[in-house]
């Protein structure tokens, strides 16, 4: 219906342009939206307020001219001017009921569209280092990324979900060396475990797996492993005035780097055993965790596979005049594209930087023919956006193809108090822990119920409560309530048939029923807006509102009654609410239970 109204408004604009009321080059950027207040009609347009300046008249005066030029629109009973110049459109009664036919015809496809069918979009998300289990912060990125991809697919786009595996960086070397040191410990070697190594018990488990397979084949003298390694950091017993550790001596970074270098030299090809064992153990754990969470990927892209692409990317930048040498390092002229300073892409020792790998990865993405790239990063990567976009432009591509969405941190609350997010050894509360406590549905729902750049205070008590304050429970309960109602109707021998019930739809005359019909009709617009804005919370809020309307109506008015026609009409309304709730929950990755 909104398409027909918009077409009529466009026709009116063309007429007014021909009459000289509006400039011929005026671009109509107005919005046509569903009204929240039923007294304001079904749709409202701000076209007169947007065009008043160009027309040189007051918005209400322009609105009158637009109405006069507006062609007749089928199923619109009236259009009127309201407030400072809004034009409100009222549907006739039959058109309001048409949404019931549309939902029943489209079923699980209702709300989906082909609006973005021309787009091929890659959504890269989570991409956590495979060095430990996913924590609750990663969980938010997983839920958000998966739901954004779902929404884009629902609007017709071809979507690829990708996880970038950081399997070639320093953190993996720290994990591999941590595993090797635990391996030596388990085989009876005495050593002081580095403060900057990975401390978790999972490292010992990986090391034990290597022992079970290869025994003591990789044992080397501990003295040689620690030979000429700089001293590890030593801290004072007391913290400073701000609660931070006070360094007495040593350097934890240089210490672990020395251990990495010695381990690589002593083990030779054997070092890869520890590197790969650690990588695959953690990556398999991450894959299992995400799959259990309903988050899947088309591709797990290995950073280690980018070696040739890094050379290609740097050569491209060099040929285009955007690299230079200084102090033995190779620098990218990112300041020419608005970055705050130039960035090193290759160090004097010949090693390329993580940024160089990121440039190569985005070159690879662009060469795969995507119309749009969506990167979902943690909020601490905010400063990284400008340099990546600069590199894309410098290589001759359009950085506008890249959208970077930042995901803020998550705080857990229980009993009105913030939960300690990490232990003394730095182990964070894991996604698996959260899922075990509140379930997948609550986690998937509450993770996306705020804009991604907003902090989330995750109330663990609320997430498991069975009350209307728990939004996901309230929505699921509405769906289950309708299922139970249909079962009850069937058990009494009531014959319900959609086409027959449709003939009694006019009995849905209560304000509450009209409001539910309008809310159902708004669903496709909500999905499209949520997809284009990358805002899943719009769907979540819509479902909350629809569930609240249904519960309020159900509590006040009997659905199964002695009035056969009214019963049929209300059952028809209910099954349409049920369908839309199910469709929306599916987009959010939340189940629609039939009983609760």
Swiss-Prot record:
Keywords: Aminoacyl-tRNA synthetase, ATP-binding, Cytoplasm, Ligase, Nucleotide-binding, Protein biosynthesis
Name of the protein this chain belongs to: Arginine--tRNA ligase
InterPro entries xref list: Arg-tRNA-ligase, Arg-tRNA-synth_N, Arg-tRNA-synth_N_sf, ArgRS_core, DALR_anticod-bd, Rossmann-like_a/b/a_fold, tRNAsynth_Ia_anticodon-bd
Localization (cell): Cytoplasm
Reaction catalysed by this enzyme: tRNA(Arg) + L-arginine + ATP = L-arginyl-tRNA(Arg) + AMP + diphosphate
Organism in which the protein naturally occurs: Acinetobacter baumannii (strain SDF)
Ranges spanned by the short sequence motif 'HIGH' region, renumbered to the chain: 128-138
Gene responsible for this protein: argS
EC code: 6.1.1.19
Gene Ontology BP annotations: arginyl-tRNA aminoacylation
Any GO molecular function: ATP binding
Quaternary structure (record): Monomer.
Family membership: Belongs to the class-I aminoacyl-tRNA synthetase family.
Signal sequence segment: none
């Amino acid at each position: 219906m909104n398409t027909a109204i918009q077409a009529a408004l466009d026709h009116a604009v063309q007429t007014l342009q021909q009459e000289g009321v509006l400039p011929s080059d005026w671009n109509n950027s107005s919005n046509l939206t569903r009204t929240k207040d039923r007294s304001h009609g079904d749709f409202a347009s701000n076209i007169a307020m947007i065009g008043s300046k160009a027309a040189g008249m007051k918005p209400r005066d322009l609105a009158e001219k637009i109405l006069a030029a507006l062609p007749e629109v089928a199923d619109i009973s009236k259009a009127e001017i309201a407030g400072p110049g809004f034009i409100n459109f009222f549907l006739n009664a039959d058109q309001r009921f048409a949404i019931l036919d549309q939902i029943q015809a489209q079923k699980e496809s209702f709300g989906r569209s082909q609006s973005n069918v021309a787009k091929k979009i890659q959504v890269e998300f989570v991409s956590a280092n495979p060095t430990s289990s996913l924590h609750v912060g990663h969980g938010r990125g997983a839920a958000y990324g998966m739901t954004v991809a779902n929404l884009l697919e629902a609007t017709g786009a071809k979507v690829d979900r990708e996880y970038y595996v950081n399997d070639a960086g320093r953190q993996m070397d720290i994990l591999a060396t941590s595993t090797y040191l635990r391996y030596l410990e388990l085989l009876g070697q005495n050593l002081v475990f580095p403060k900057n190594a990975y401390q978790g018990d999972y490292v010992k488990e990986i090391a034990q797996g290597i022992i079970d397979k290869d025994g003591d084949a990789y044992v080397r003298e501990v003295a040689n492993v620690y030979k000429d390694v700089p001293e590890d950091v030593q801290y004072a017993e007391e913290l400073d005035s701000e609660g931070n550790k006070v360094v007495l001596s040593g350097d934890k970074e240089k210490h672990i780097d020395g251990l990495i270098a010695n381990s690589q030299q002593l083990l030779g090809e054997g070092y890869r055993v520890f590197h790969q064992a650690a990588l695959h153990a953690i990556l398999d754990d991450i894959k299992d965790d995400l799959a259990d969470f309903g988050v899947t990927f088309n591709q797990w892209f290995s950073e280690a596979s980018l070696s040739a692409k890094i050379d290609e990317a740097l050569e491209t930048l060099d040929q285009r005049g955007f690299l230079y040498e200084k102090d033995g390092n190779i620098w990218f002229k990112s300041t020419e594209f608005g970055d705050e300073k130039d960035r090193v892409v290759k160090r004097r020792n010949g090693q390329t930087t993580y940024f160089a790998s990121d440039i190569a990865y985005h070159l690879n993405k662009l060469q795969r023919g995507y119309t749009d790239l969506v990167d979902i990063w943690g909020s601490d990567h905010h400063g990284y956006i400008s340099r990546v976009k600069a590199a894309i432009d410098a290589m001759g591509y359009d950085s506008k193809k890249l959208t970077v969405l930042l995901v803020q941190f998550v705080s857990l609350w229980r009993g009105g108090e913030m939960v300690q997010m990490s232990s003394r050894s730095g182990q964070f509360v894991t996604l698996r822990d959260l899922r075990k406590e509140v379930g997948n549905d609550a986690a998937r729902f509450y993770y996306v119920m705020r804009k991604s750049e907003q902090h989330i205070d995750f109330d663990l008590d609320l997430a498991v409560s069975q009350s209307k304050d728990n939004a996901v429970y309230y929505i699921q309960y509405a769906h289950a309530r309708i299922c139970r109602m249909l079962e009850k109707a069937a058990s009494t021998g009531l014959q319900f048939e959609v086409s027959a019930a449709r003939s009694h739809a006019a009995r849905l005359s209560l304000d509450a029923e009209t409001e539910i019909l309008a809310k159902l009709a708004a669903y496709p617009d909500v999905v499209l807006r949520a997809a284009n804005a990358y805002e899943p919370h719009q769907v979540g809020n819509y479902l909350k509102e629809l569930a609240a309307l249904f519960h309020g109506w159900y509590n006040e008015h009997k659905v199964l009654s002695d009035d056969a026609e009214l019963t049929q009409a209300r059952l028809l309304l209910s099954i349409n609410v049920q369908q839309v709730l199910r469709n929306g929950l599916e987009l959010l990755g939340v189940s629609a239970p039939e009983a609760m």
